[in-house]
Each structure stands twice: as C-alpha cells, then as structure tokens.
A protein has these predicted regions:
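A well-structured
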Residues: 1-143
Length: 143
C-alpha cells in the first residue's frame, strides 16, 4: 500500500513540476502571443493536481496506507509525512473546485500583469491583482 501511495505522490509531483516549469516560462521567456495559452495550460494542470489531491481514490490510498502493516515499519519521519498528507487531503477537500480554478487563474494572470508592471516600472497596474490575490487567499484559508 505504501508503494501505491508513493506512485500516486510521484504522479502529483510530476504534474506540479510541469506547472512550475510552465510558470517559469510564463514569467521569463514566453512571447506575448503565447502567454494566454500558457496561463490556460498552467490552470489546466493546476486543476489536474487539485483533482488528484482531492479524489476519493487518493483518500482511500492514504487511509489504507496508514492502516497497513507496512506503515508500522516506517521511520517516524515517514509516518509523520503520510499523516500530514492525510491532514492536507482532508483540508484541501473542503475547497470548492470552482473557487480553486478561479484562484489558480487569478494567480497565473497576475504573473502576466506583474511582468508588465516590472517592465514598465508601473506597479499601480498590479495593485488590483494583488488586492484580489490577498482577498482570495484569505477566503482559501477559511475552508
């Protein structure tokens, strides 16, 4: 069961790594013409991660892993890590999918505006995005 959890975690990590690379590309190198496509692609993969991290299958894998015989043979740090994954899973499931999708898109679009604001030395253009990100982050942590 622990191996199944490791494989599931690896899939999540691979998609998160892809998101990070795409986000870096968006901030550093992406031509203006491709920026909206990259924002949509990053949001798509963010939602894939969200769905993996909130799925019933993932929850069952976590519960089964903790109840397995293998779990009792793990190092203490590994046990804490898996229990922490379960705690995050239970918290993350409370976040509505539509909210998370909007939150993801907002952060990715804000990256575009931030890039332009830095280039033009006009940080007022980023202000509304920053306010919205702060507002949405506060909402996110109420779930």
């Amino acid at each position: 069961m622990i191996e199944k959890l490791r494989k599931y975690q690896e899939e999540i990590a691979n998609i998160e790594y892809t998101c990070n690379l795409l986000s870096w590309e968006l901030r550093i190198n992406a031509p203006k013409k491709s920026q909206n496509d990259l924002v949509n692609l990053i949001s798509y993969y963010d939602m894939k991660v969200f769905n993996l991290k909130t799925s019933d299958e993932y929850g069952q894998i976590l519960y089964d892993a903790i109840e397995s015989e293998e779990f009792s043979r793990l190092e203490e740090a590994e046990e804490r890590y898996i229990k922490n994954l379960l705690r995050h899973y239970e918290q993350f499931r409370k976040v509505p999918e539509t909210f998370y999708n909007e939150y993801s898109k907002m952060k990715n679009n804000a990256n575009l505006v931030w890039r332009d604001a830095k280039e033009n030395n006009d940080f007022n253009m980023f202000k509304p995005y920053l306010s919205k990100i702060i507002e949405m982050t506060k909402t996110y942590y109420t779930y």
